[in-house]
């Protein structure tokens, strides 16, 4: 599954204890991952690091943090494709993520192949959307 692509940039909102494993799982793809721990870091990193093709975020955050993070991610230009990860995925979660513009839901723990495939599909979708947007200008 380790198919290399031109520098796919990922913005990952994942707990510190998950970051090393995720970096290891995605290393064969040659991606660049910027980890953030809160929405303040998102503002700072997005301004200084350019655009991202993929954003990875959890399905649940305390105190409506998910909606705060979601609203900030959707304001990035160009908007990255959002992969939401969860311990379990119901139809309600999956359809809710798609309804608000997310790309997909992936269930953790995910295998190397699952996370690599999800990232590559999201990055392809991002590139197609950007190409279509340029064609419509």
What name fits each language-model region?
Residues 2, 7, 124-137:
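CheY-like receiver
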Residues 39-45:
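Short alpha-helical segment
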Residues 17, 61, 88-92:
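Conserved phosphotransfer active-site motifs of two-component signaling proteins
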Residues 110-119:
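C-terminal output helix
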Residues 16-37:
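Two-component/phosphorelay signaling modules centered on CheY-like receiver
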Residues 68, 86-104:
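Alpha4 helix (beta4-alpha4-beta5 surface) of REC/receiver domains from two-component response regulators
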Residues 19, 43, 52-79:
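Conserved phosphotransfer microenvironments
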């Amino acid at each position: 599954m380790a198919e290399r692509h031109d520098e796919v940039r990922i913005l990952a909102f994942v707990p510190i204890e998950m970051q090393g494993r995720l970096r290891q799982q995605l290393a064969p793809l040659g991606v660049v991952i910027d980890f953030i721990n809160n929405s303040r870091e998102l503002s700072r990193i997005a301004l200084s690091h350019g655009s991202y093709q993929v954003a990875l975020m959890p399905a649940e955050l305390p105190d409506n943090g998910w909606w705060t993070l979601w609203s900030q991610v959707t304001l990035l230009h160009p908007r990255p494709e959002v992969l939401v990860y969860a311990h379990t995925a119901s139809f309600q979660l999956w359809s809710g993520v798609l309804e608000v513009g997310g790309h997909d839901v992936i269930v953790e723990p995910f295998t190397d192949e699952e996370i690599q495939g999800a990232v590559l599909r999201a990055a392809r979708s991002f590139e197609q959307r950007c190409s279509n947007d340029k064609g419509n200008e």
